A protein has these predicted regions:
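Acidic-enriched and Gly/Ser
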Residues: 2-17, 23-26, 32-150
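Phosphate-interacting basic helix/loop segments used at nucleotide- and nucleic-acid interfaces
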Residues: 13-24, 152-157, 251, 306, ...
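P-loop NTPase nucleotide-binding/switch module
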Residues: 88-90, 97, 101-104, 117-167, ...
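Walker A/P-loop NTP-binding active-site region of P-loop NTPases
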Residues: 165-216, 271
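Loop/turn-to-beta-strand initiation segments
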Residues: 199-201, 228-231, 262-266, 337-342
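Nucleotide-state-sensitive switch-loop elements of NTP-binding domains
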Residues: 200, 210-254, 284-296, 303-308, ...
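Phosphate-binding/switch loop-helix module in NTP-utilizing enzymes
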Residues: 243-279, 331-332
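Conserved catalytic/coupling modules of large nucleotide/cofactor-utilizing molecular machines
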Residues: 274, 281-528
């Protein structure tokens, strides 16, 4: 006991221990669940919660704040209600609902939260950008007019209802009329641009579809080599209504990631009718007042704020960098000249385009492609009704050669439909009417195009020139498509330079002379 403990040593040890204490504390703002059911929960105690903020439940389930009331917060669950009960603790994340995006998502199938659901493992999110799901659309000053075409590879669309990069073009029609087919063919047609090093990145948003339908679509895109530049966002029919509601916003956020970095992107919303139904379901459960057809009053604003995010961004770098509502992570990475094109799809009931949601979306978009079940059943596919289909801004984006050869095609087709209807009542026709009907029938056959066979724009110009100039008047109607294939094979092998020139927008007498001579040689074989 000779060694006495010195007070100075004790104080030194205590001092060292005190200095090593980490006194920083983390405070989480928490609330408790009042009630839960039907994919919605009410939380008490989150006085500072923000609209669209992410909340986290004890069991890891995430939710998004939708209703801010005096004494509670209404939120929609992004998962199952299983395991969530009254009194459970919920904490604020202080993050607005967002999705993490990077190039590793290309070729994958994800849910609206950005999680992979294709069974290929997690996506490497190194260097990912945090893109908000809901974001203000670019103001007028940061946009520029639509002037570059988005080639769909579909003759009837590229010639009569052209789509430009940055446009919103609605695809509308009854169920089973080929709406998705037009969107998928457009995605497949971007393969040549991707291989040429000028990619148009595609985002396909599947809302409320069967999982088997989505799997079949992914398989088709794989077979046609379209997955390397495509991302599929899927909220299937088995997912909660909230996931179906947020799926298009996730697709738009991914599209903005490419758009704001100077690339071109295409987003397909298939379909917004189901999103509106999901929003109606969530709103009614949250006891929001309902309006026409029981949809909430702001269902127009739901679609307008989503579709306004499609834009062509100003080429001037210094202007693009000042873009409104730019996410923090995107600052310093913005490049001008990018575009986001939207192809929303709406399903009508018995061809009624005057219903609430169809009229809303028609008034928001820059034109519509109307598909008719009667035409589809007659074998005219894509079943585009030329009379009420229109593109309000795409005409200025058409290449010169296409604009010149297809300028009268839409009027000619509408005139043919009208005359054909009258011809059923009258057997005797004058020569001009008979010729108009004959040419119309042949043009109808030219515009028929099987699914998954998009056509390069140069070939489209060549064959439409032959149709509009009556170069196939000697060919029987039933042989027109066969004649078309023979003609295109001959032009591809013997006059590839002509196709290339037409694709670049050139058209002159020397080029048309080659087309006329080639068609004369081919049509001669079919002369009656």
């Amino acid at each position: 006991m000779s060694d006495k403990i010195k007070p100075s040593e004790v104080s030194q040890v205590l001092l060292e221990q005190l200095q090593g204490i980490n006194n920083s504390q983390q405070f989480d703002e928490v609330g408790t669940v009042l009630e839960v059911g039907d994919g919605v929960a009410r939380i008490y105690g989150l006085r500072n919660a923000e609209a669209n903020e992410l909340l986290e439940f004890e069991n890891g389930t995430m939710a998004i704040v939708m209703n801010l009331e005096e004494d509670n917060v209404g939120c929609v669950l992004l998962g199952s209600t299983e395991g969530i009960k009254e009194g459970m603790v919920v904490k604020r994340t202080k993050r607005i609902a967002s999705i993490r995006v990077n190039d590793n998502m290309l070729g994958r199938v994800i849910n609206p939260l950005g999680q992979a659901i294709d069974g290929k493992g997690e996506i490497d999110m190194t260097g990912a950008f945090e893109m908000p799901l809901d974001r203000k659309a670019p103001c007028v000053i940061y946009r520029q007019p639509v002037k570059e075409p988005l080639q769909t590879g579909i003759k009837s669309v590229d010639s009569m209802i052209p789509i430009g990069r940055g446009q919103r073009e609605l695809i509308i029609g009854d169920r089973q009329t080929g709406k998705t087919a037009i969107a998928v063919d457009t995605i497949i047609n971007q393969k040549s641009f991707y291989e040429a090093g000028k990619p148009v990145y595609c985002i396909y948003v599947a809302i409320g579809q069967k999982a088997s339908t989505v799997a079949a679509l992914v398989e088709n895109l794989k077979q046609h080599g379209a997955m390397p530049y495509t991302i599929i966002v899927a909220a299937t029919a088995a997912d909660p209504a909230a996931m179906q509601y947020y799926a298009p916003f996730a697709g738009a956020a991914i599209g903005e990631y490419f758009r704001d970095r100077g690339y071109s992107a295409l987003v397909v919303y298939d379909d917004l009718s189901k999103q509106a139904v999901a929003y109606r379901e969530v709103s009614l459960i949250l006891r929001r007042p309902s309006g026409r057809e029981a949809y909430p009053g702001d269902v127009f604003y739901l679609h307008s704020r989503l579709l306004e995010r499609a834009a062509r961004i100003n080429d001037q770098q210094e202007v693009a960098e000042q873009m409104n509502d730019l996410p923090e992570c995107m600052k310093g990475h913005v490049k001008g000249g990018g575009s986001l094109t939207a192809l929303p799809i709406i399903e009508t009931q018995a061809g009624d385009v005057s219903a609430y949601i169809p009229t809303n979306v028609i008034s928001i978009t820059d034109g519509q492609i109307y598909l008719e079940s009667d035409l589809f059943n007659q074998g005219f596919r894509p079943a585009v009704n030329v009379g009420i289909s229109v593109s309000r801004v795409g005409g200025s984006a058409q290449i010169k050669s296409m604009k010149k050869v297809a300028g009268t095609l839409k009027i000619d087709m509408a005139q043919y439909r009208e005359l054909e209807a009258f011809s059923k009542f009258s057997s005797d026709m004058d020569a001009v009417t008979a010729m108009t009907i004959d040419r119309g029938r042949k043009n109808n056959q030219l515009l028929i195009q099987p699914q998954y066979t998009p056509m390069p724009v140069g070939e489209q110009v060549a064959i439409i020139y032959c149709g509009t100039h009556g170069l196939m008047h000697d060919v029987p109607v039933e042989k027109v498509r066969e004649c078309q294939e023979t003609f295109l094979d001959k032009v591809r092998t013997q006059h590839a330079d002509v196709i290339e020139a037409l694709a670049s927008g050139k058209i002159d007498n020397s080029l048309t002379a080659v087309l006329e001579q080639t068609m004369a040689d081919v049509a001669g074989q079919y002369k009656k």
